[in-house]
């Protein structure tokens, strides 16, 4: 029983830490997306190029 209890607390702390990290990641991603959206609206001519570059960068990072 003690052994099970220990593993349970361990997994719980791990999940908590993971969740916190994920939240910050999502927040930064959302902010970045908002910025890119604004930039896209302004520059219509360079839309394809900027989009391609941004998607490539995002895929590599995340």
Swiss-Prot record:
Keywords assigned by UniProt, alphabetized: Chromosome, Developmental protein, Differentiation, DNA condensation, DNA-binding, Nucleosome core, Nucleus, Spermatogenesis
Chief site of localization: nucleus
Keyword match Acyltransferase: no
Residue ranges of the TM segments: none
Tissue expr: Testis.
S-S bridge residues: none
Keyword presence, DNA-binding: yes
An example Gene Ontology molecular-function term: DNA binding
GO CC term, one of those recorded: nucleosome
GO biological process: chromosome condensation; sperm DNA condensation
Source species, domain of life: Eukaryota
Spans annotated as Disordered: 1-62
Subcellular location: Nucleus; Chromosome
Protein task: Protamines substitute for histones in the chromatin of sperm during the haploid phase of spermatogenesis. They compact sperm DNA into a highly condensed, stable and inactive complex.
Assigned protein family: Belongs to the protamine P1 family.
Protein name (database record): Sperm protamine P1
Species annotation: Trichosurus vulpecula
Gene: PRM1
């Amino acid at each position: 029983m003690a052994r099970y209890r220990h593993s349970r607390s361990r997994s719980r702390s791990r999940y908590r830490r993971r969740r916190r990290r994920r939240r910050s990641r999502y927040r930064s991603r959302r902010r970045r997306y908002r910025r890119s959206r604004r930039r896209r609206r302004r520059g219509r001519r360079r839309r394809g190029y900027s989009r391609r570059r941004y998607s490539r960068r995002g895929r590599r990072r995340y």
